[in-house]
Design a protein with these regions (language model features):
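PLP-dependent amino-acid enzyme catalytic core
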Residues: 2-395
Length: 395
């Protein structure tokens, strides 16, 4: 292969520039195409999105005052909360990453930065949707399990809606957003075991005490897929058609499945001319969706819980059971997409690349989709087209 300018590549260089290379000592097939930046060793970076004060304009403060006050009629509270929801959540930045294009050689690369949401991640989209549903149905308390980001989002949404919030966290995790969650008025309960154990406890409490269950899966799947589908509509609003591919970091698979559902709706209504390929990226050997895709499994298969280890970088991505894994796997395969792994080091390095090149401070785990996209471009040079990477959280 030759360079774009006709000169041959030096040994060890890739056909798409020198910004990335395969991790040393690991087979390309084993890593699922994982990439490493050619920079120094990664430094520890916190997993949770950065906590920042939530400052609303006076008119929205007035809406929150109505939504959170039980003295107002339910219809007025719902309207006020919806006004805050529509104003503050979603409609996040989509911008062309020209500097990363120059680093990698992949042209027409767009970054969809969901760190612009109130608590800094895409989880605000589903948290506000669930709080809206809870308020409409007459609940006074919402509950969910979390390792940090969803708990912060749900606690904020509940406080705006005048709802109590109980968040269940796995005792073995260091929830760095705990002070923020409590500051929003939520009650935190530690649960022995992993995230899945915390989900089970939250659901049991919801059933026994008649609380609103805001956990992913089950009856909430439709609500959450619709909420994440808004990402697709926002991309369409900017590009006026579907990109060639959309790359997303995955954990439970809900965000990816929702984005696919949104584009499918646009395609069926004749708004877009094609379905984008759906790409998944996640932590190395710690996510059932990527593992199942690479192994060729027909359905999303659980991993061995004893082999899942949390780090300061991979926490937003890891689990042994992906709640919406089957939906995510179907989205990848039905669009002829792909999935690959990302190591902690590569995610930390790409986080620094996004910061230095495009001025966005992102969670390292948010770059797993970008890594998966560039891995495929390294192996099989992608066509000159438009590509979107969803960056799910700010640092």
């Amino acid at each position: 292969m030759s360079r774009h300018d006709g000169r041959p590549w030096a040994a060890g260089e890739s056909g798409r520039g020198r910004a990335y290379a395969m991790e040393e000592g690991r087979d390309d097939r084993e890593m699922g195409g994982q990439l490493e930046l050619e920079s120094g060793a990664a430094v520890p970076i916190l997993d949770g999105a950065g906590a920042r004060p939530i400052q609303l304009p006076p008119e929205l403060d007035a809406e929150v005052a109505i939504a959170s006050d039980e003295a107002f009629p339910l219809e007025e509270r719902l309207e006020a909360f919806e006004n805050v929801f529509e104003s503050e959540v979603g409609d996040t930045r989509l911008a062309r990453a020209r500097n990363i294009e120059r680093e990698t050689g992949l042209r027409q690369l767009y970054l969809k930065f969901d760190g612009g949401n109130p608590t800094g991640t895409q989880k605000d989209r589903i948290a506000f949707a669930q709080a809206m549903d809870a308020l409409r149905r007459g609940y006074d308390t919402v509950t969910a399990a979390t390792c940090g980001n969803y708990g912060a989002a749900l606690a904020l949404a509940a406080s705006f809606a005048g709802l109590r919030c109980e968040v269940f966290v796995p005792s073995g995790y260091h929830v760095r957003r705990a002070p923020e969650i409590e500051r929003y008025g939520a009650r935190m309960v530690a649960v022995e075991g992993d995230y899945e154990a915390a989900v089970l406890r939250s659901r049991e409490e919801a059933e026994s005490r008649e609380l609103y269950d805001a956990n992913p899966g089950g009856a909430n799947t439709t609500i959450q897929l619709r909420a994440y589908g808004e990402i697709s509509y926002e991309i369409y609003d900017e590009l006026r058609d579907a990109p060639a591919a959309v790359a997303v970091p995955v954990s439970n698979g809900t965000t990816l499945a929702g984005i696919h559902k949104g584009f499918l709706s646009l395609y069926r209504r004749g708004k877009i001319s094609r379905m984008p390929k759906i790409i998944a990226g996640s932590a190395y050997r710690k996510n059932p969706i990527v593992q199942s895709f690479l192994s060729g499994a027909e359905a999303c298969e659980d991993l061995d819980p004893s082999k899942i280890r949390e780090t300061a970088v991979n926490e937003p991505l890891i689990n042994w059971h992906s709640i919406d894994g089957d939906l995510a796997l179907d989205a990848i395969r039905s669009t002829s997409g792909w999935a690959s792994y990302a190591s902690d080091r590569s995610m930390a390095n790409f986080s620094r690349l996004v910061s230095s090149s495009e001025g966005l401070t992102v969670l390292p785990a948010s770059t797993a989709g970008l890594i998966a996209l560039l891995a495929e471009d390294r192996r099989h040079e992608l066509a000159n087209d438009r590509y979107v990477v969803v960056l799910t959280g700010r640092r």
